[in-house]
């Protein structure tokens, strides 16, 4: 602990009420956030002679200052704690790296309802089904629903302006409510009701109604209609037979955890109406010496309390470990949801099977992640050997993308010892150059990236320039002219040129623009990591360019005229 921090004097000022505390190091950085039912008692525990773990010892040794926020209740303290963790990202807290909103399937409240994927706040009138683990799961489900229940998935702007049915109607994927006379209101409403029941997990009701309609059609000698309904019944049965369904039909989130080699994986199964909608694995940042129960407890708090605006809370959460604050967490979540939320750690029956499945998936995902990291380490070691460097801890790669010189975008991607560091990927809009001048674009992005102060830990060991000798010459010129405080001679500049037929494995590498290039064998691990970071940079640049091009495509030329505001633009367009 720092000599400048007087723990005894500080503890005399601390209250015994519930609240949240923030610990700072000598640089004024928040290094830990915690909550307590009794602040005085909890903070006193940090300054005993025998501490519980090495992690706590390392934390206390760096404390320079502690700030305290008193709250009315322990529940309020729990919510505030996770808000602070999200805000400050302290290095001694377990940190959930994923904070994306989850997608839902949206059934609109229009006269002829549509199905669509939805993320974010639920403002639009209609029904929301989910959450699903990712966009792919939603799109896959929508494609399946379109085959079984042909209700529209088009945007309202398209729907309102159609005078003839589209291709989806022609291939039997939509009933065509956009054109009068193609489908009756009753038939369309019936298909919408089937979708509603199906997404709610009530497959039996869907099948019962369909079978009844098929028998009625058959009795009325409407054999084509009966055959169509029969095909629909078979499609529903094929889907429902594919997955294990709990008899309870409850909404659950099941959380399993695995830990190995200093890395944790938390796997979440999303179960709605007794069906597994999908799952997702998370790899929270875990400080050394952290107990596994703390990983689970912190993850659950951050997962639900930080993302409460975007996540629908299930009726029950099954956990792999006992929590010290299980009741507090359940009460906080219940208060947030406005209904009772159960947190269970010792399930039986189907629930135990779900927990075992989540645990197995966590272990499998962790093994895969560790294997990937091991591969990256091997490749970086091989690259360091090829480049005659002691080690490669950090690499950055640049690429340029444009269409006929327009909407030029440069990308910078970053790899560290564990592979892609996507949080540090950057795109740069390139302006003020001759259209199509890739050399000027590379010159500009390198000056913007490196012509400023850089923390020592962020100085790359290798900078890859995609484009060969000419682009490498630009990079050399930029670095020769840089006037910066950090060691600009540390990064090794490496040019990468594709082969004559631009096939992977035929790349030529250059240390100097004037020198001879060299190639690596196609099976070289060093070449593989170069190809990986170059492809990431290429994809990142193209992605940025496409977004910029789409934005320009959807922008009126009137918007570029100074002094012409939204109202005047609207008047010009209308008149």
From Swiss-Prot:
Protein name: UvrABC system protein C
Biological source species: Shigella dysenteriae serotype 1 (strain Sd197)
Source taxonomy: Bacteria, Pseudomonadati, Pseudomonadota, Gammaproteobacteria, Enterobacterales
Signal peptide annotation: none
CDD domains per the UniProt record, alphabetical: GIY-YIG_UvrC_Cho (cd10434)
Entry keyword set: Cytoplasm, DNA damage, DNA excision, DNA repair, Excision nuclease, SOS response
InterPro entries hit by this protein: GIY-YIG_endonuc, GIY-YIG_endonuc_sf, GIY-YIG_UvrC_Cho, UVR_dom, UVR_dom_sf, UvrABC_protein_C, UvrC, UvrC_RNase_H_dom
All copies of domain UVR, residue ranges: 204-239
GO BP: any one term: SOS response
Function noted in UniProt: The UvrABC repair system catalyzes the recognition and processing of DNA lesions. UvrC both incises the 5' and 3' sides of the lesion. The N-terminal half is responsible for the 3' incision and the C-terminal half is responsible for the 5' incision.
Pfam families (alphabetical): GIY-YIG, UVR, UvrC_RNaseH, UvrC_RNaseH_dom
SMART domains the record matches: GIYc
Cellular compartments per GO CC: cytoplasm; excinuclease repair complex
